[in-house]
Amino acid sequence: MAVVKCKPTSPGRRHVVKVVNPELHKGKPYAPLLEKNSKSGGRNNNGRITTRHIGGGHKQQYRLIDFKRNKDGIPAVVERLEYDPNRSANIALVLYKDGERRYILAPKGLKAGDQIQSGVDAAIKAGNTLPMRNIPVGSTVHNVEMKPGKGGQLARSAGTYVQIVARDGSYVTLRLRSGEMRKVESDCRATLGEVGNAEHMLRVLGKAGAARWRGVRPTVRGTAMNPVDHPHGGGEGRNFGKHPVSPWGLQTKGKKTRSNKRTDKFIVRRRTK
């Protein structure tokens, strides 16, 4: 995988930095694992904007990813690695011995021809999925379940991982990339290794149009608006003379947004970033 800086042949190419992976499949994705993925434009069922800065973008099809990895005891061979427009990580098409194909998140170091497996008897190697009670303390894992059988929810983005730091009875303690340490049940599954495509964070789109291809619309500063449009709007010059607030008048810097008090008991240490 290479990080390529484009030559400045035009203003739009001058700052572009691309991540090139020659191992990715250049053909079409596996059709039986595709689904329609309609765009909302950031609107809800009433047509009102619920998420700003979303709209347009290229049409995409959703790839059905196997986050549960519950096909136990049946070995699978990696057929190819693919690009997925719906996530930062790459995905791998795997063929199980019984003939079924599934997409999984491609961990770091996985390549075509490798063999993977799920279940309590799986070997301790990257790409294999086991209950965390069977994974050695100190291991790095990804695609971590928060409830047994629900499917992986933690550490699914490119280059991310979770470290198992302790095992205590029916719970394991995890250290997340944010610095948070939390407990989950030891019967929850995780996939060994870290998610691949870690160079994704180094890419530079280079121009506004590249963001529009991805369905991202411009973000306008509140102080550049009129008073009718934003609490920061209006006035002479750039000063808005008050504490920073959202377009709806709510405190916007440093305000706590976590509301799920029910699971606070599982958080051993709060995140640090």
Curated annotation (Swiss-Prot):
<comment type="function">
    <text>One of the primary rRNA binding proteins. Required for association of the 30S and 50S subunits to form the 70S ribosome, for tRNA binding and peptide bond formation. It has been suggested to have peptidyltransferase activity; this is somewhat controversial. Makes several contacts with the 16S rRNA in the 70S ribosome.</text>
</comment>
<dbReference type="InterPro" id="IPR022666">
    <property type="entry name" value="Ribosomal_uL2_RNA-bd_dom"/>
</dbReference>
<feature type="compositionally biased region" description="Low complexity">
    <location>
        <begin position="39"/>
        <end position="48"/>
    </location>
</feature>
<dbReference type="InterPro" id="IPR005880">
    <property type="entry name" value="Ribosomal_uL2_bac/org-type"/>
</dbReference>
<dbReference type="InterPro" id="IPR002171">
    <property type="entry name" value="Ribosomal_uL2"/>
</dbReference>
<protein>
    <recommendedName>
        <fullName>Large ribosomal subunit protein uL2</fullName>
    </recommendedName>
</protein>
<dbReference type="GO" id="GO:0002181">
    <property type="term" value="P:cytoplasmic translation"/>
</dbReference>
<dbReference type="InterPro" id="IPR014722">
    <property type="entry name" value="Rib_uL2_dom2"/>
</dbReference>
<dbReference type="InterPro" id="IPR022671">
    <property type="entry name" value="Ribosomal_uL2_CS"/>
</dbReference>
<dbReference type="GO" id="GO:0016740">
    <property type="term" value="F:transferase activity"/>
</dbReference>
<dbReference type="InterPro" id="IPR014726">
    <property type="entry name" value="Ribosomal_uL2_dom3"/>
</dbReference>
<feature type="region of interest" description="Disordered">
    <location>
        <begin position="221"/>
        <end position="273"/>
    </location>
</feature>
<comment type="subunit">
    <text>Part of the 50S ribosomal subunit. Forms a bridge to the 30S subunit in the 70S ribosome.</text>
</comment>
<dbReference type="Pfam" id="PF00181">
    <property type="entry name" value="Ribosomal_L2"/>
</dbReference>
<dbReference type="GO" id="GO:0019843">
    <property type="term" value="F:rRNA binding"/>
</dbReference>
<dbReference type="Pfam" id="PF03947">
    <property type="entry name" value="Ribosomal_L2_C"/>
</dbReference>
<dbReference type="GO" id="GO:0003735">
    <property type="term" value="F:structural constituent of ribosome"/>
</dbReference>
<dbReference type="InterPro" id="IPR008991">
    <property type="entry name" value="Translation_prot_SH3-like_sf"/>
</dbReference>
<dbReference type="InterPro" id="IPR022669">
    <property type="entry name" value="Ribosomal_uL2_C"/>
</dbReference>
<keyword id="KW-0694">RNA-binding</keyword>
<keyword id="KW-0687">Ribonucleoprotein</keyword>
<dbReference type="InterPro" id="IPR012340">
    <property type="entry name" value="NA-bd_OB-fold"/>
</dbReference>
<comment type="similarity">
    <text>Belongs to the universal ribosomal protein uL2 family.</text>
</comment>
<keyword id="KW-0689">Ribosomal protein</keyword>
<feature type="region of interest" description="Disordered">
    <location>
        <begin position="28"/>
        <end position="54"/>
    </location>
</feature>
<keyword id="KW-0699">rRNA-binding</keyword>
<dbReference type="GO" id="GO:0015934">
    <property type="term" value="C:large ribosomal subunit"/>
</dbReference>
